[in-house]
A protein has these predicted regions:
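N-terminal [4Fe-4S]-dependent radical SAM core
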Residues: 1-22, 31, 35-42, 166-174, ...
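Conserved Radical SAM active-site core
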Residues: 2-3, 17, 32-118, 122-123
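Residues at the C-termini of beta-strands that transition into short coil/loop
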Residues: 7, 103, 134, 158
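Glycine-centered loop/turn positions within well-structured domains
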Residues: 28
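Short glycine-rich, flexible loops that bind phosphorylated cofactors or substrates
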Residues: 76, 138-139
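P-loop/Walker A phosphate-binding loop and immediately adjacent motor/lid segment at beta-alpha junctions
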Residues: 83-91, 140-181
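Receiver (REC) domain switch/active-site residues of two-component response regulators
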Residues: 128
Length: 181
């Protein structure tokens, strides 16, 4: 698996201050994608041990809230395989840090569609928040937090796993599905 970029101290792609990994490779190719340069599976650099260790070290400070994974497309089968053991390591080392994952696929497509692989369920088990659905230019809304178009959902994966149905995440402190640190 390759990656196009690693951003440290990112505040745009999930709650709080985060490290963000942009994987390479996307077959969906949404019109008006903000990250076209990551469509090729060979874009960027190899996601090797040096890159993994740099990300793990970047998650150490208390002010870093977690890791966000974007693309390209993290849920391409090749990328699922490349990410599953790494996200397992992140969760084991930093259980208090959240993992956000952005995908152009819907949760339903991932759990019962052609993108489901032998790695999918395990990969999803390490993800705290899944932002799903393709970016749709006609539904673009710059007032939305953490997503680009209104068709995209922010899914609370722990609540979804517990109930067996999609539970949306909310950052409203009164009706939140998550606890604040």
């Amino acid at each position: 698996m390759n990656y196009s970029t690693i951003k440290y101290c990112d505040i745009a792609n999930g709650e709080g201050v985060r490290t963000t990994l942009f994987v390479s490779g996307c077959r969906r190719r949404c019109p008006f994608c903000f990250n076209e340069e990551a469509w090729s599976f060979t874009a960027g650099r190899l996601f090797d041990d040096e890159a993994r260790q740099a990300i793990l070290a970047s998650l150490e400070p208390a002010y870093i809230d977690g890791l966000s994974v974007l693309g390209g497309e993290p849920m391409e089968p090749e990328n699922q395989h490349g990410l599953v053991s790494f996200l397992e390591t992140v969760k084991a080392r930093y259980p208090e840090k959240s993992i956000w994952c952005y995908t152009g696929d819907t949760y339903e497509e991932l759990t019962s569609g052609p993108k489901r692989t032998e790695d999918t369920d395990r990969l999803l088990s390490f993800i705290d928040i899944l932002v799903d659905g393709p970016f749709v230019q006609d539904l673009k809304d710059i007032t939305l937090r953490f997503r680009g178009s209104s068709n995209q959902r922010i899914i609370d994966m722990a609540a979804t796993r517990a109930t067996g149905k999609v539970v949306l995440w909310t950052d409203d402190p009164v009706f939140s599905t998550h606890t604040m640190n």
